[in-house]
Amino acid sequence: MKLGSPALSRVLSPAVRARVARHAGRLGSLRRSAVLGALLLAVGAPVDAEAKGLTVDDMLAMQRVGEPAVSPDGKWVAFSVRDTDLEANRGRLDLWLASVDGAQVRRLTTHPDADSSPAWSPDGRWIYFSSTRGGSAQVWRIAAAGGEAEQVTKLPTDVGGFKLFPDGKRMVLALEVWPQARTLARSMEEDGAKAKAKGSAQIYDQLLFRHWDQWEDGKFSHLFVWTPPELGGKADDAKDLTPGLTTDAPTHPFGGMEEVSISPDGKWVAYLARTGTRDLAWTTNTDVYLVGSNGQGTVNLTAQNKAYDFQPTFSPDGKTLAVLSMVRPGYEADRQRISLIDLASKKTRVLTESWDRSASTLLWSRDGRTLYTTADNVGHHSLFGVDVATGAVKVLVEKGTSGSPQLAGERVLFARDTLRQPVELFTVKPDGSDLRQVTRINDERVKAITWGEYEQFSFKGAKGDTVHGFAMKPAGFVPGKKFPVAFLVHGGPQGSFGDHFHYRWNPQAYAGRGYGVVFIDFHGSTGYGQAFTDAINGDWGGAPYEDLMKGLDFALQKYTWLDGKRMAALGASYGGYMINWIHGNTDRFKALVCHDGNLDERMAYFDTEELWFPEWEHGGTPWGNPEGYKKHNPIDLIKNWKTPTLVIHGGKDYRVVDTQGMSTFTALQRMGVPSRFIFFPDENHWVLRPHLSLIHI
């Protein structure tokens, strides 16, 4: 999974993005209208006029619920809702408020700029939030009872994120500064001097000189403590907790304020930062630091571990810090263990060593006896409770995709979605009983759609192992008829195509156009044990390809409504690589779609930014282990290409650079293979602007 944090980086936090970015990173994106148009031409899917399946317009109309924050009394939840503003060609975020019992819901903000990241004041009177009103990202607040929002911070630079102290009197802010400046005021002076400089040359002496979709400019995100003027602080200044830091806190490109935790007494701040200088591009060493809220006494709590450590979370009594940790340096998809650091002795205890799942969030119960977490789990992303004393794990909500757990009185509130339900908020008792839905933001839209029915299946794949997948019927399914097949290949490669409502790779969008959809969690996927995830290392085109072909054969035999003579395969990121590999190994598909996929693994090493990824996956560098890069390299099988192919790439994709897509298209054209290239000059590894979702070809 390649995104900026461990495997979720390919798919978001190193914990939260350890599926939002982690799953996101190498999961990739796909523009549905363009792709579906190509498939209709190549495969000829019927569209049932009676069945109103999911369309791209429906996806854009869905309101995206996120960022739940429960009030101190546990009775209310503030959350963000993203609407698509087609005229402005962007998403717009507003804040909403609902009672935890689901009886009441109302909109709090309606400003055309983005309002996000709600956080409650300790007395429950105010909801603080980030907003871009006025052209700069600052902290604002609005009364929970309603009214006009008021600006809280008025700093001379954007606030990248914030977290309130437990007493509500101070904040930790993430601000981009020049590390040598030492103070915010001096950093602003440096900005002024840089603005006056003539010329645009950028000079680099080390990697990473660009990351994800941004070129490095010498500034880094630091953590500051800001005190409001009425309590003795300065409106335009703050105390740097990380002076001189030459990496980002929170980490870039996907880290957020979940990487920062404040002790219950407000005396300490735990945070995450990359470790290293010249080796940043080929090390995964990320450590958890502890610093006094006065800026004194910084200590590295995880210096002994040279792999990922992230998601620091103080216990209710402030004596213990829970963190997520990997143990293998250089491997971003290692198992994420829950570790407990005793802050008095600085000793660490691994809580979940015997649990063969990767935890991705951390939430303490009020009594400190349970840690709630979520993890990929056999095609789902489940909610779990972990006993802090014994490490015993209990599944609380198994099916669907669960995330963002919060304490809500005597219940646990969390976000949940499935393949036929966008994210809504739910609560459950701590023992996993009495599941209740809190919000119904998209109920009417969901009811208006004929959803493709789906089921999970398993088969004997590579190495004789059990492999899982999903099959989805077209929205207009008619017994006795056969339907063309959209065969989706997930990215990562350490990711999962599970029971999740995805806004880029959504199988229902294909089912809505008359396709039967098949997607397989091949060797390398997450949620089936670490050995299964590790199996892809050094074997990118081996066991995964075998799983895909065997899984498709199994589905064609089991689901007789799938038409094996009319099939298209589609994938992005690693999935795009696999499309190129499939192209060289079989001609069973009528059409192929390659989005942001590598053609040449050797050159891809020199193109990409996070070198630890190919070095682990292919067993070293191209000069140290050339056979590792040659073993399953699509470029060596171009001579076999003959299937019509659509190639899609973004110009700001620095993970899988655009020349890989251009090279794929060049090879197709030179070979005389019917092909088309869609290039998005301003998009990165994902295509995010709403209007680009509506492109028809």
Task: Locate predicted features.
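Non-catalytic accessory segments flanking enzyme active sites
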Residues: 69, 172-175, 196, 200-205, ...
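Residue-level detector of Asp-centered blade-edge/turn motifs that repeat once per structural unit
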Residues: 72-73, 122-123, 166-167, 264-265, ...
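Hydrophobic beta-strand positions that form the internal "hydrophobic ladder"
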Residues: 74-77, 124-127, 171-172, 269, ...
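A flexible loop/linker signature enriched in serine peptidases of the S9 family
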Residues: 81-94, 109-116, 130-140, 148, ...
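Short loop/turn segments that connect beta-strands within beta-propeller blades
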Residues: 99-103, 143-147, 228-232, 292-296, ...
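Short beta-strand element of the alpha/beta-hydrolase
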Residues: 481-491
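Active-site-proximal cap/loop segments of hydrolase catalytic domains
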Residues: 506, 511-513, 519-695
